[in-house]
């Protein structure tokens, strides 16, 4: 059995979980998320209020989806209680970010400013001109938006200029050897 899938999911107080067929809806203080569980996997509520994810057999597809389904539901519960946040930093002379309402405007060495529109459920906050945060309740969406922003100007290996995740270590290369 899947070791992750076997674990029961604790449901904290203040979180309402509704199971309707294969659809799981989680409501909490930060919002509401819904997800449809793949077909062979079943989810039910135990007597102690925890959620259990089960699979009918040991087929390869069922094994693959077992741990995944459990983790997705657990991530939804964390999202509606605590939320998710990714921090990104900008390195480079003249590179900066400013908040324009709900959106972000970047100066990243292009001939024009780059504007990133906040999708529904995502909030941006700018701490410094070189440090900003992407936050929301959907872990997948937060990560996707952060990755798309990083993709605008990924860090280059020679000077490290660009947008990177906070704490990310950029593999550096030596420059040209030069003439002697």
Swiss-Prot record:
Keywords from the UniProt entry: Ribonucleoprotein, Ribosomal protein, RNA-binding, rRNA-binding
Listed Pfam families: Ribosomal_L6
GO molecular function, one term: rRNA binding
Transcription recorded as keyword: no
Gene3D superfamilies xref list: Ribosomal protein L6, alpha-beta domain (3.90.930.12)
GO cellular component, one term: cytosolic large ribosomal subunit
Cysteine pairs bridged by disulfides in the record: none
Keyword rRNA-binding belongs to the record: yes
InterPro entries: Ribosomal_uL6-like, Ribosomal_uL6-like_a/b-dom_sf, Ribosomal_uL6_a/b-dom, Ribosomal_uL6_bac-type, Ribosomal_uL6_CS
Listed GO biological process terms: cytoplasmic translation
Matches recorded under PANTHER family: 60S/50S RIBOSOMAL PROTEIN L6/L9, LARGE RIBOSOMAL SUBUNIT PROTEIN UL6M
Family matches, as HAMAP family: Ribosomal_uL6_B
Function as written in the Swiss-Prot or TrEMBL entry: This protein binds to the 23S rRNA, and is important in its secondary structure. It is located near the subunit interface in the base of the L7/L12 stalk, and near the tRNA binding site of the peptidyltransferase center.
Assembly mode: Part of the 50S ribosomal subunit.
Family statement: Belongs to the universal ribosomal protein uL6 family.
Identification of the protein by name: Large ribosomal subunit protein uL6
Organism: Salinispora tropica (strain ATCC BAA-916 / DSM 44818 / JCM 13857 / NBRC 105044 / CNB-440)
């Amino acid at each position: 059995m899947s070791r992750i899938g076997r674990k029961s999911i604790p449901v904290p107080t203040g979180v309402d979980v509704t199971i309707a067929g294969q659809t799981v809806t989680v409501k909490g203080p930060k919002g509401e998320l819904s997800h449809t569980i793949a077909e062979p996997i079943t989810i039910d509520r135990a007597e102690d209020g925890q959620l259990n994810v089960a699979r009918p057999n040991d087929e390869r597809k069922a094994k693959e989806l077992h741990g995944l389904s459990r983790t997705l539901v657990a991530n939804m519960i964390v999202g509606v209680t605590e939320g998710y946040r990714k921090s990104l930093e900008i390195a480079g002379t003249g590179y900066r970010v400013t908040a324009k309402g709900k959106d972000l405007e970047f100066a990243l060495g292009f001939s024009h400013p780059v504007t990133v529109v906040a999708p529904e459920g995502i909030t941006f906050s700018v701490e410094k001109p070189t440090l900003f945060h992407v936050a929301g309740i959907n872990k997948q969406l937060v990560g996707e938006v952060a990755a798309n922003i990083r993709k605008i100007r990924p860090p280059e290996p020679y000077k490290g200029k660009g947008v990177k995740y906070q704490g990310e270590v950029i593999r550096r290369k030596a420059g040209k050897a030069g003439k002697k």
